[in-house]
Amino acid sequence: MSDKTPRKPTAFRLEQPARVSAASEQEEPRRPRAVKDLEQITPQADVFDLTDDEAAELEILDPAFEAPERKGWSLSRILFGALGILVSFAIGIWTEDLIRALFARADWLGWTALGVAMVALAAFAAIILRELVALRRLASVQHLRKDAADAAERDDMAAARKAVDALRTIAAGIPETAKGRQLLDSLTDDIIDGRDLIRLAETEILRPLDREARTLVLNASKRVSIVTAISPRALVDIGYVIFESTRLIRRLSQLYGGRPGTLGFIKFARRVIAHLAVTGTIAMGDSVIQQLVGHGLASRLSAKLGEGVVNGLMTARIGIAAMDVVRPFPFNAEKRPGIGDFIGDLARLNSDRNARK
């Protein structure tokens, strides 16, 4: 029992808290009124966006490159080979006569000429060796393209591993492929299909190089387009296209690890000359431009700017052909670039330049 006396029951009233009406919290509705001068923004279509028909016409200009297979000796090879042998004999006889004549005058002159001739011969042999190595490297890239395409088509795992190992060897000296090669090494044992291995190697190793190659082709095309638009003579256009195309092919070859020598570069020159022939015919006038790139686009550009766009497109086509030649793997997992990828940038570039004038 507790010593405290329990409290007697008493009655008390609980105070109710003030209720806030939900209706009072709402703001007074705005009275309806008419809004005048309502600004409307209508999106405008880009005038340089290609329609499906124009894109199809441009893709016709850009067929996939197929390296022709030449077997045996052609008449041109026999001719230049025979002329090369005759020139070599002539240089040898002239050098021998010169050294004999110098020995007849003074012994030290003869020995000096003989030493210089030996140095020149050693340098010539080194150049020939370097060119042969470059040609062999170029031929190995061509064979690797065929082997990779064949392995992907037949889904041959052994052939795919061999092709990927060759690709690793080519890309070993390219810093941009280090991350892709590391990832490929970690995933190679987990892949059981040859086609998937080829696609993975193309994606991880060649994708960064493809991205850089697209940038090189686009920048070269822009430079050609600008020079064509401002040059007063067609001869200047052709000369600059030759210079820019030559530099573009060499830079793409170095990018993909091909590094062709002088003799290897001559093989590319035939395709460049063919493209330049097309470029020269395009410079005739706006009617040919309309036939090539569509009436819609040509009507939006002046004649000179249109020639700049088309010359830029031909440079882009040369760059795409060079990518087909020097790329170790054919385009399978990655999308092959086309002329339509560059037309918008070239047209906008010339349009902006025309607007600033």
From Swiss-Prot:
A Gene Ontology cellular-component term: plasma membrane
Pfam families: DUF697
Assigned keywords, A-Z: Cell inner membrane, Cell membrane, Membrane, Transmembrane, Transmembrane helix
Compositionally skewed regions (Basic and acidic residues) per UniProt: 27-36
Family: Belongs to the UPF0283 family.
InterPro entries referenced in this protein's UniProt entry, alphabetically: DUF697, UPF0283
Protein name as it appears in the record: UPF0283 membrane protein BAbS19_I09770
Topology in membrane: Multi-pass membrane protein
Cellular compartment(s): Cell inner membrane
Region Disordered, annotated ranges: 1-36
Species: Brucella abortus (strain S19)
Transmembrane stretches, start-end: 78-98, 109-129
